[in-house]
């Protein structure tokens, strides 16, 4: 078990020992060396830096690059749309390149997206709308 893998287990388990044990068991069943990347891939969790990268793409690159980055995250980590929104929300407080006002506006956009998806709105369209809104709120 690599040190970074242990930190990843703490991150994905959110203090739930059962989740931590399950994450370790699944990763160990696939490889004799449990790595950070393996933990994130097997728990359908995007690493914090990947989520920050998506928000940075919204800020600096615009809609299409941010949209591609989001799709890549969903595909690579097997995330459902609501999981993506929840993980983004969880990590938003640590995004240094956004001020408090921007974080508030992004939180509102994520909440609206989550609500619409839970109510049955199409995931792809809702995530695109969220990306467009975030780009408008924090973009150059």
Annotate each predicted stretch with a short phrase.
Residues 1-5:
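Conserved small helical "lid"/interfacial subdomain of P-loop NTPases
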Residues 6-12, 18-32, 40, 53-56, ...:
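C-terminal helical "lid" of AAA+/P-loop NTPase domains
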Residues 16, 30-33, 45, 60, ...:
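Residues at alpha-helix boundaries and the short loops/turns that link adjacent helices
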Residues 36-49:
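AAA+ P-loop ATPase motor domain of ring mechanoenzymes
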Residues 54-140:
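Helix-rich C-terminal "collar"/helical-bundle subdomain used as an assembly and partner-interaction module
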